């Protein structure tokens, strides 16, 4: 009697019309309830409704009200949190396979089967890749998954590496080697093997792709400037453009440098041997001649050539730095030619640093942290690596070589893989101006700074550089750290565009073709120009893949480091150890602080910062916390933190700020 009843249909429409829907993301709690985080509001999800969803699901829900209390009833799934995911194997008491998702907020064990291609015998706590096959809101059944890939056994000491690489879908093996390698590029090359080229790198480096030779330019026995010859390894001499190696490099895009080892972009026979500029071996290279005056100004167009070169010495950063800095009992050059090359390179570097300080932008000094590992992958120690004068020698040589490459490609090829950075995101111009004026302006200089920091000025390379130079000597770190949040991301482009971060109008890397696929592409373009061949324009898919691969590699580096820090600090987690730290981030949930002596990130929950959590106000514009109108913590602030807990399963390190 109710079938096709118009009154019933009308009633259903009225009920539906009266429903109040909301969309948002599910946030799980430590209990069996959760919250739906919608725009500027949070709704309670009762335990029964939470069984339909998991943390991170994007859902549509109906708002329910009982008195002054609001909750939601889940209606439908918009996007699931999980698709492909990392998990640990769990077998329940009946021996049924379940998967514990490797995510700090997802605590349910998902029933699963194993794909037939997975042949390993699974055991508790093994690491696997899985695919979510069913979702209660999408498939009218319970959560269910399938193991699609075995990662490693539970007791594998290198699990942090293998799991992280699998999470970000990065290869863990080198590119498959060929039976033999022959020189594909048979075009004539200059023989520069008589020049005293040297490399400066870390002692353990095998994939050396740059070597330097320098000499003064003189006129009537008076020095007028410098002639720098930069020789770059030429893997394109061995790699055909349509080869399997080329396709693999195009997918990988970069050599992955991980704690303890690297995963090369090219087969190791090429990256560490045939193409590497090892001492006393003749190697094919792409070479640029660069001429500057004594102040570091380029005085003529750079000249590119294919050549044969032979490195005469492999030098180490610390040895060269110790020598130049006059450290007692430091390493010494073993011949007059080497001593002369180091001296001249040092003089050239000083001139280029001065040039960049006036005409471009210099990098802010930052410490790097290196993990020293035991054979089993455990962390033996963490060393601070400082940016010393030998590092600057290579840095300045590579920067000027990359500037010359960009100018050459822009002029002759009209395309290339250019490194660009547009400075601040345009939507942030006014916020940047307001922030800088609030921080720096006085009654006397407000008018001047309003013009200096205006959106029209910040949008130009010259205006951005002027702003950077003005704030260079500001003593507090929060200014620099806050400005970083307003920046846009660096991009790869097929047409020349300025790099605001460097303060340079033309920039294209070609100096690391063993390690970067974009540099291989630029090598091929340079050769096409030199040989008067047709220029191949850059495919947008290459730029997109470079961008994505760079992002993936950074995530891999971060995730492995987080895991190793957790392992390293776990044995002392309950010993009340205190560290000098710098606040690197602040949110409503708490503070993140970097340990200065080892680089670890410690999270300090907001609940530990003040006796009354409700009195704490987070001001996102300042990245600061206030209580009763008084600023108590700000990004960049120095503080002391006591280590309180390390949770290895979530790779999280917790602490309390010492008042």
Swiss-Prot record:
GO terms for cellular component: cytosol. Belongs to the RNR ribonuclease family. RNase II subfamily. It comes from Haemophilus ducreyi (strain 35000HP / ATCC 700724). One of its GO terms (biological process) is mRNA catabolic process. Residues 189-530 form the RNB domain. Its EC number is 3.1.13.1. Residues 576-658 form the S1 motif domain. It comes from the Bacteria. Involved in mRNA degradation. Hydrolyzes single-stranded polyribonucleotides processively in the 3' to 5' direction. InterPro entries: CSD, NA-bd_OB-fold, RNase_B_OB_dom, RNase_II, RNase_II/R, RNase_II/R_CS, RNase_II/RNase_R, RNR_Ribonuclease. It holds the Pfam family RNB. One of its GO terms (molecular function) is RNA binding. PANTHER family: EXORIBONUCLEASE 2, RIBONUCLEASE. Keywords: Cytoplasm, Exonuclease, Hydrolase, Nuclease, RNA-binding. It catalyses: Exonucleolytic cleavage in the 3'- to 5'-direction to yield nucleoside 5'-phosphates. It is found in: Cytoplasm. Its main location: cytoplasm. The keyword Nuclease applies. This is Exoribonuclease 2. It is an enzyme of class 3 (hydrolase).
């Amino acid at each position: 009697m109710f079938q096709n009843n118009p009154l019933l249909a009308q009633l259903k429409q009225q009920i539906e019309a009266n429903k109040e829907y909301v969309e948002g993301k599910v946030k799980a709690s430590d209990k069996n309830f959760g919250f739906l985080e919608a725009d500027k509001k949070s709704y309670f999800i009762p335990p029964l409704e939470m069984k339909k969803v998991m943390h991170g699901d994007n859902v549509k829900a109906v708002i329910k009200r009982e008195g002054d209390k609001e909750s939601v009833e889940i209606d439908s799934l918009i996007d699931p949190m999980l698709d492909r995911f990392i998990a640990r194997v769990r077998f329940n008491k009946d021996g049924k396979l379940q998967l514990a998702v490797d995510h700090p907020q997802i605590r349910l064990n998902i029933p699963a089967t194993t794909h037939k291609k997975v042949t390993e015998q699974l055991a508790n706590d093994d690491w696997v890749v899985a695919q979510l096959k069913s979702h209660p809101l999408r498939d009218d059944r319970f959560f269910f998954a399938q193991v699609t890939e075995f990662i490693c056994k539970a007791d594998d000491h290198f699990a942090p590496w293998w799991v992280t690489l699998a999470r970000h879908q990065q290869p863990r093996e080198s590119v498959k080697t060929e039976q033999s390698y022959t020189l594909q590029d048979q075009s004539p090359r200059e023989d520069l093997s008589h020049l005293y080229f040297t490399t400066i790198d870390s002692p353990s480096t095998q994939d050396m792709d740059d070597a330097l030779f320098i000499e003064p330019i003189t006129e009537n026995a008076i020095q007028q400037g410098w002639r720098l010859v930069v020789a770059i390894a030429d893997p394109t001499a061995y790699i055909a453009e349509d080869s399997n190696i080329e396709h693999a490099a195009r997918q990988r895009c970069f050599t992955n440098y991980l704690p303890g080892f690297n995963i090369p972009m090219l087969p190791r026979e090429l990256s560490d041997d045939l193409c590497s500029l090892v001492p006393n071996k003749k190697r094919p290279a792409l070479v640029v001649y660069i001429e500057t005056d004594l102040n570091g100004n380029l005085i003529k167009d750079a000249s590119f050539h294919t050549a044969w070169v032979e490195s005469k010495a492999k030098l180490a950063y610390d040895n060269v730095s110790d020598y130049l800095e006059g450290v007692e009992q430091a390493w010494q050059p073993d011949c007059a030619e080497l001593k002369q090359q180091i001296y001249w390179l040092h003089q050239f570097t000083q001139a280029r640093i001065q040039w960049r300080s006036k005409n471009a932008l210099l990098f802010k000094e930052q410490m790097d942290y290196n993990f020293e590992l035991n054979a089993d992958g455990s962390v033996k120690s963490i060393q601070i690596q400082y940016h010393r004068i030998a590092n600057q020698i290579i840095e300045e040589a590579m920067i000027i070589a990359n500037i010359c490459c960009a100018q050459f490609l822009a002029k002759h090829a009209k395309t290339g893989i250019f490194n660009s950075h547009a400075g601040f995101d345009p939507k942030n111009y006014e916020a940047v101006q307001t922030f800088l004026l609030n921080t720096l302006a006085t009654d006397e200089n407000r008018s001047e700074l309003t013009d200096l920091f205006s959106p029209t000025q910040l949008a130009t390379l010259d205006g951005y550089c002027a702003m950077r130079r003005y704030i260079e000597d500001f003593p507090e770190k929060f200014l620099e750290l806050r400005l970083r949040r307003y920046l846009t991301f660096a991009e790869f482009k097929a047409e020349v565009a300025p790099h605001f971060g460097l303060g340079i109008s033309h920039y294209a890397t070609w100096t690391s073709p063993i390690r970067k696929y974009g540099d291989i592409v630029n090598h091929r373009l340079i050769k096409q120009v030199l040989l008067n061949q047709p220029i191949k324009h850059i495919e947008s898919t290459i730029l997109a893949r470079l961008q994505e691969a760079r992002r993936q590699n950074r995530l891999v580096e971060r995730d492995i480091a987080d895991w190793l820090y957790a392992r390293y600090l776990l044995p002392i987690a309950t010993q009340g150890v205190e560290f000098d730290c710098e606040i690197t981030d602040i949110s409503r949930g708490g503070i993140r602080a970097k340990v200065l002596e080892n680089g670890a990130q410690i999270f300090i929950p907001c609940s530990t910062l003040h006796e009354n959590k409700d009195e704490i106000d987070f001001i996102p514009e300042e990245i600061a916390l206030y209580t009763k109108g008084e600023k108590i913590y700000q990004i960049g602030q120095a503080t002391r933190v006591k280590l309180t807990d390390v949770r290895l399963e979530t790779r999280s390190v917790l602490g309390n700020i010492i008042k």
